[in-house]
Amino acid sequence: MEAERLNAIQNTLADLKSRADDLRRYLDYDVKSERLVEVDKELENPEVWNDPKRAQELGREKKSLETVVLALTKLDEDLTGAAELFELAREEGDDETIEAIEADTAGMRAIVEDMEFRRMFSGPMDAANCFIDIQAGAGGTEACDWASMLLRQYLKYCERKGFKTEVLEESEGDVAGIKSASIKVEGEYAFGFLRTETGVHRLVRKSPFDSAGGRHTSFSSIFVYPEVDDSIEIEVNPADLRVDTYRASGAGGQHINKTDSAVRITHIPTGIVVQCQNDRSQHRNRAEAMTMLKSRLYEHELRKRQAAADAQEAAKTDVGWGHQIRSYVLDQSRIKDLRTNVEISNTQKVLDGDLDPFIQASLKQGV
């Protein structure tokens, strides 16, 4: 095997080892390793299960710690082993082994790049589960159909990422599509991945609802907010709430069950409205709606404190030209993020949930 190729493999392994060592420092590998041992010992104590809430918190912490510790441990072992094997194979002129190591470096590079990407999740709630609210805006029936396309897009994206999803509320459009929907997303860094999707999404296409085949523009808004767990105290005065019950009006099928026990809660001081209709039990729907409300109130307060409420709340209330984050021009095969200038021509792939190019660019640019 030529010397240039051998040197390239050696340099790649050295570069990956250096980046992995940097990750161990950035991600506090030593501290997390020690804490993982402590958590394991605590979970091995039978008395911890007398306090289910504490046991649950420890279980979540263990899972989070293992994600970093086990991945970095294996990466270090793989890189060290590959470097040692490479030197032996090079001395013996074993081209077959060297080619296998060269192939393995691609997988190790992908792991390093993924962990470097996850370093961008520095927000206090990035690791949390989240909710996605979808609201049809300007454009009538076309906008309702667009909202249903976005619902499908995000469900497909979450499926690709291995996230668990549940459609909590889905209101049908008068002719087609949906007026609104709320999704709960459960998975590691669900909010971190999805938070930059908040904003208005614009669709331009030849409308299937126009017999003349005219080109139509419509809008739908996306609002993503983290689920607040019991460790964060959110006080809600019952006097500030209006609770309405109604018959579910969703599209049915695989997403949602028709019930007579849907719940809508309005927080009067802020005007925040949450709805849940996925369960046949009114009690469970109300409990889920309260979780959504507390999460919304937490996010609302955070945005106020960070002086970012203007842009975010405008995106919720003014679903029109002025607050777009992404433009989907289907008849020109072009989807463009207006914040990062990332542009994709394979529109169907994006609508089928391949949002990673947009999300990664927005996180890297600190959108």
Curated annotation (Swiss-Prot):
Name under which the protein is recorded: Peptide chain release factor 2
Molecular function per GO: translation release factor activity, codon specific
Keyword Cytoplasm found: yes
Location relative to the cell: Cytoplasm
Post-translational modification: Methylated by PrmC. Methylation increases the termination efficiency of RF2.
Keywords: Cytoplasm, Methylation, Protein biosynthesis
Protein source organism: Ralstonia pickettii (strain 12J)
Pfam families: PCRF, RF-1
Gene3D superfamilies given in the database record: 3.30.160.20, 3.30.70.1660, Release factor
Superkingdom classification of source: Bacteria
Family membership: Belongs to the prokaryotic/mitochondrial release factor family.
Record SUPFAM superfamilies: Release factor
Sites bearing N5-methylglutamine, chain numbering: Q254
